[in-house]
C-alpha cells in the first residue's frame, strides 16, 4: 500500500524530520596519533602562501625528497616520478582509499581513480582520466595504477564474465607494453604509442567490457635506434626467451644476430627482466583469449621482421642493388610464404606510375633497396600492432548493456631531441591538443561558464595555445600538415623537391609562434621551442608503401599476412591517399571529441631529472615543466573559482533527500522550481551562503569540503532511515519490556507486601486476642520485616555483629532488634540493661556490646538458647513490652526481656518452632529468677508516663488498646504523576495508554492589572529598600505545611547594592624632628620638619621610611609618629521608598535581623525508625538514634544505661 501525503501533516512532518535526520554522534575522545606522518610542505598547492612557479617548485622538491610524490591542485593530481618503488601501491594502501573522498586521505593516484569511479556511479556521467607530461615522467605507471584500482573496487565477485573482463583489462598492460614500449635515453619503459582505454560499466558499476584506441605508433624504431636505446621490448623478449620450437621453426637466435636489435649496442636494461616479461606477455595473450595459432602467427611475423633486417644489399656491375646472402632471402620467403624471386623483385625493382598512366619499372640502388626493405619491416610491425589492438578489443567487447564508462588516456609525452622530425612533430601536436583540452576544460571553460552563469569572481589571465594548434592543423590558412600535403602533390616523385617546396611554404607563413630557419623551422610549443628538420619530413608524411611491396603481400600464401594487410591494391588509382599527418589529425580530433563528452580528471606528471635517479631533483628542468604545464595558472584559478558546479535539475536529483521539504520516504515531493529546491536544500543542510552561488542554470559550490559534506550526508541518509526504524523498533521493545517490568514490579510489590501483611495478621492470632495493644502496633503502614539490624547482610554493622556471634553459614536470622534484659544487682533492685536480641532458625541469642581495649566496641555473646529448649514464653495481658523465656536451666535463671517488637518476634518464633511454641498470656509474667525458683512479676497500670518501666518487682504501664484490636487500613500514598514509559523521544507521552497525568496541579491565576494599577505603573515608582523588603517578608506568617509558589511573571526587586570595599589600611606618617644625613646607601637623608611614611618598624632603633618614591632606613629617635586621620563615617543608607499613595514614608529605625520564617526553613530530615531500643520508662530503652557502627551502638548503650539510672522519661508511644 502506497504512502498518502496529506497537506495538513506536511508542516508537522517537516518539523519532526528536520531535527532527527542528522544522526550525529558524540565525538570520540581525542587521542594523539603517533602513527600519523608529519606533512611535508603542503599537500595541495592551493594552500601555498605565495603562488609562483618558484614556490610550487620548492614545495614539490620538499615532498620529492621526503618520498611524497603526489600533490593536489584542487582535483588535479601532480605526480613526480620517484624512479624507485615506494611501496605505496599495495592492496592494503588500495583498500584504505576505497570509499574515501579526496580530503580524507593523502594525495594519491588511487584517490583520483576513486573519485572518477564514484562520480560515474553517483552522477551517471562518463569519466576520463587525462595523464599528461613529458616522456619518462610516469604516465604509463599512473595509467596502470588506475586500472589496478578500478579492477579491485568495481565488484563483480571472483568468477564470471565480470571478473574475466577485469583480468583481461589488466592483461592489456603487459601485452601492449611489450609491443609498444621501448627503452629510450630518458625512460627505460617509454610508451612509443598513444593509448586510450575505455572501460564500460553496467548500471551497478561493474565492468562489462572495454575498448582500446591506439595513436601513432613510432614504427621507425623498428628499423633503427640511436646508441643506448632499444627496439620494442618484444624483440628482446622473443629472442631471449623463445621456446625451442620457435627457434627451430622461425630460426630465432640471440638479439646480437639481428641488425634491427644490435645496431644500438644495447641489449639489457637495468630493472627489466626480458625473460620474465616474456612469460608475462604469453600469459597476457592467454588471458585475453589469443589461440595458440594466433600466437604462432604473431611470432612468425616478428621473426620475419627480424630476418628482413638481415637482408643486406651490394652493388652489382651496373650499380644497382643485389642481395648479398641468398639464404636470408630464402628463409624470409619461407616465413612470409612468398616466392623468393618475387621477394627480391619487390624490394630491388621500383614501380613508377606517371600521370600519363604508363607503368615504369626502375632498378633500385643500394640505398633505395635498403629503404624499401625497412618500409616492408615497418609496415608489417605497424599493421601487426593494429591487429593485436583490434583482437584485444574483440575479446573485451561488452557482454552486457553498458551504462557509463571511464577512459584512461596514456599518450606519449612532449619530446624535444637534438634532431626532431615528423615523429616529434606529430607527438608534440597531440600534446598541444591535450593541453588545449586542459585549458578549455579547466581554465577558459571555467571562466566562460562563470561569465555565462553570472557568477561573481575574479578573472585570471592565462595563455591559450589554440594559436599553436591552428598553426599545425589549419587548412585555411594552410598549416604545417597542409603545407606538407601540398608539397607532396607538387613534387611527389622527388622527396628532396618535396622538402624544398615545403620549406618555401614555411617561409611564406606569418605566425608569431613559427620561426623559419635554413633547412629547418622552429615552433614555439607550450612546453618550449622545438627545432624541426625539414630533410625527409615530407616523405615520412606521405607514408606510402610501394605497389610492388603491396603486390608481394597480396600474393602471399599466409592467410594471417592478408589479415594484417586488409586493404586491396588498386593498380589504376592515382588519387593521393591520406597522409600520415591527415591520419594523426583525424585521430587527435576524434580523441578530443571523445574527451569533451566526459567529465575529466587530470594527472600532470613531472620528471625530476634526466638520469633516472631516485635522489636527484633538477630544479631548472622541473621549473620548466611547471611553466609549460601551466600549474601556476591552475592554482590561481582554483583558488578563485568553484570546485563543483551542476545544473539545478541534476543537483536536486542528487541531493533532494537531504531536505525534509523536498523529500519524504525517498520520494521527491517539492512542487516548486528546481532553483527554489536547490536553495531549500542548501538552507536545510546549513551550508553557509559564502560557500555557494546560484547561476542562471547551475548551482556552484566553492570548496570541495562542502561537496564532500553533502555527499557524506547523502550517504548517511539511508543509514539514518534504517537507524530510525531500528530506534523505533528498539523503543517498542523497550516499551514492551518496561511494561512487563512494571507489571512484575507491581506484582512483586503486592506479593511481598501481602507476605508481610500476612505475617502481621498472624501476629494478631498469635496473641489470641488476650493482650492489650499499643497504638503504634496497629498502624496501617506497619509491616513485619524481621531482620531489622541486617544480621543476614554481607556488609555493615549487622555483618560485623554476625561475625562476632560466629553464626554458621546455614544459620539465618529471622528477627533482630535492640532490646533490654533485666539484670539482678547484688544488694539492690534489678535494673534493665541494653542488649541485642537475635532469633535465627535454630537459636535465640542475647548479645551485649561492651567497650574493649582502645575504646573499640566488642560483641559479647551473653546467652543463647536452642529454640527447642524454650519451654514457654510468658507475657502479660497489658500493653507492656516485657516477656520471659522459660528455659528451665539448672545453672542459670530465665531471662526477662523487653522488646518493642515483641508481637513480631513471637510471630517469627512460631514460624520456626512448628509444634513447640507455647505462649503464656496472663496477669503476671512468670520466670525463674534463680535456677529452679519461679517468680511472678506483677503488671500495674499506674505509670505516670506513657512508657512502661520496671521497679521493685513490678512493671508499671498504662491502659492500652483493646485486645481484639486489628491493624488499620493501609494509608494511600501521595498521588504522583505517572512516570513516562520510555526516555528520550517518548512513545507514550504520559502514563499507561498515553493519557495525561491526572494529578491536580495548583495554578494560581494571575490577576489582570486594573486601570489604577496600570496608571500607577506608567510612571517610575520608587522600589523598597532590600532590607526593608526582607524585613517585611519575614514579618508575614506563612503556614509551615504550605509551599510558596514562585511567580516568574512578577517584577523582581532590584538586587541589593554590593558591600563596600574594606577601607584601605591607613599609612603611618611621621614628622622628622632632627636632620639626618645618610652615610650608607641603605640610609635615607631627612631634614627637620619633613613628613615621611613609615613602611616598617624594627626593634633595633631603625625604621624603614619612604620619601619621594625612594625608601631606606632612618633612626627611630629622629622622627615622631603622627596620629592617623580618623576613618570617614560610612555613607547613610538611601531613604525608604515612598508610600503607595504617593506620600513620603517616615524613616523607620532599622529592624533587628528577622528569624527565618517557618515556611522558608528546610524541614528536618526524618530519622529512620530505630527498632533496636525498647520503650521502657527510662531513656536507656527509648534512644532512637540510628547506629551506623558498632562503636555507635556501644556508645548508645552506655548512654542509655546512664539515663536509665537517672530515671529519665521519654515521650515515645509504641
From Swiss-Prot:
Stretches with biased composition (Pro residues): 1053-1065, 1127-1138
Region named Disordered: 1-33, 948-1066, 1122-1196
Domain (IQ): residue spans on this chain: 719-739, 740-765
Nucleotide-binding keyword on record: yes
Gene3D superfamilies tied to this protein: 1.10.10.820, 1.20.5.4820, 1.20.58.530, Kinesin motor domain, Myosin VI head, motor domain, U50 subdomain, SH3 Domains
Family: Belongs to the TRAFAC class myosin-kinesin ATPase superfamily. Myosin family.
Protein name from the UniProt record: Myosin-1
Organism: Chaetomium globosum (strain ATCC 6205 / CBS 148.51 / DSM 1962 / NBRC 6347 / NRRL 1970) (Soil fungus)
Gene of this entry: MYO1
